Amino acid sequence: MPKLTEIAYAKINLALHVRGKMPNGYHALETIFAFAKDGDILQAEANDTEDNLTITGPFSEGLEANKDNLVLRAVTALRQACPNKIPAGFSIILDKRLPVAAGIGGGSADAAAMLRMIGQHYQIPHELILSLANSLGADVPACVDSCLVRGEGVGEKLTQIGDRSLEEKPLLLVNPRVSCSTPMIFKNWDGVDRGALDSDGSILGAARSGRNDLEPPARKILPIIGEVVEWLQQQKGVSFSRMSGSGATCFALFDEIEDRDTAYKKLNIDHPEWWALSSLLR
């Protein structure tokens, strides 16, 4: 088998509405998932023994390459579901280019990329891939196809969006190099249902008129998130900006690539200590 390569695309929540708490203790969400063209890089090559994972890259420090890693859990789930199709082992390299605990997919995107890569190569039915993704985490199903979708429930109930107007939209992701605890952010949400996502008009209009209900508690715990959002909002040509997921990564969409590039250069001067990724929406 040749060495397989796949991108684990960075996830962005263009809007994230927390509608309440469900009987099972999870929060009911409405969100618009979008994805950058860039992310972590996965490589895998079959072997005759067992799975092994090597984690490299600028954000590899502190990550465990053990059986609890979502990438290895994804391979295990595939092998258990299709024992006659999946080899005994894979030698896997994860190039961790995105910040960890940052609100942009992280382990979920990595697991989804592994499912997508192995599933496509061994011709595993897409419905099975999505079912396995759902068993691995709330954001994993959306990350499998990594395209513009609406999510409900805990994010796993997906509705395709026909509006393709955001494809190739210039994007800037910024993280102040702090990590956010998702449970802590949800714990500090004020419990107020501020209403549903707009379902009329363009997807950009729905996103802009929406909000991220986790941004206020995240900014309260980590005020630097507010500094990032405010810096982004001040840049020329910004369509809109806010925090993604439970933070601390924030994003800005631009109307023109030139304005995004100018903002990226300016960020490296104003805040060289912050992490940034200049990309496009898929």
Curated annotation (Swiss-Prot):
<keyword id="KW-0808">Transferase</keyword>
<dbReference type="InterPro" id="IPR006204">
    <property type="entry name" value="GHMP_kinase_N_dom"/>
</dbReference>
<dbReference type="InterPro" id="IPR036554">
    <property type="entry name" value="GHMP_kinase_C_sf"/>
</dbReference>
<dbReference type="GO" id="GO:0050515">
    <property type="term" value="F:4-(cytidine 5'-diphospho)-2-C-methyl-D-erythritol kinase activity"/>
</dbReference>
<dbReference type="GO" id="GO:0005524">
    <property type="term" value="F:ATP binding"/>
</dbReference>
<keyword id="KW-0067">ATP-binding</keyword>
<comment type="similarity">
    <text>Belongs to the GHMP kinase family. IspE subfamily.</text>
</comment>
<dbReference type="Pfam" id="PF08544">
    <property type="entry name" value="GHMP_kinases_C"/>
</dbReference>
<feature type="binding site">
    <location>
        <begin position="99"/>
        <end position="109"/>
    </location>
    <ligand>
        <name>ATP</name>
    </ligand>
</feature>
<dbReference type="InterPro" id="IPR004424">
    <property type="entry name" value="IspE"/>
</dbReference>
<keyword id="KW-0414">Isoprene biosynthesis</keyword>
<comment type="pathway">
    <text>Isoprenoid biosynthesis; isopentenyl diphosphate biosynthesis via DXP pathway; isopentenyl diphosphate from 1-deoxy-D-xylulose 5-phosphate: step 3/6.</text>
</comment>
<keyword id="KW-0547">Nucleotide-binding</keyword>
<feature type="active site">
    <location>
        <position position="139"/>
    </location>
</feature>
<dbReference type="InterPro" id="IPR020568">
    <property type="entry name" value="Ribosomal_Su5_D2-typ_SF"/>
</dbReference>
<comment type="function">
    <text>Catalyzes the phosphorylation of the position 2 hydroxy group of 4-diphosphocytidyl-2C-methyl-D-erythritol.</text>
</comment>
<dbReference type="Pfam" id="PF00288">
    <property type="entry name" value="GHMP_kinases_N"/>
</dbReference>
<dbReference type="GO" id="GO:0019288">
    <property type="term" value="P:isopentenyl diphosphate biosynthetic process, methylerythritol 4-phosphate pathway"/>
</dbReference>
<dbReference type="InterPro" id="IPR013750">
    <property type="entry name" value="GHMP_kinase_C_dom"/>
</dbReference>
<protein>
    <recommendedName>
        <fullName>4-diphosphocytidyl-2-C-methyl-D-erythritol kinase</fullName>
        <ecNumber>2.7.1.148</ecNumber>
    </recommendedName>
</protein>
<dbReference type="GO" id="GO:0016114">
    <property type="term" value="P:terpenoid biosynthetic process"/>
</dbReference>
<feature type="active site">
    <location>
        <position position="11"/>
    </location>
</feature>
<keyword id="KW-0418">Kinase</keyword>
<dbReference type="InterPro" id="IPR014721">
    <property type="entry name" value="Ribsml_uS5_D2-typ_fold_subgr"/>
</dbReference>
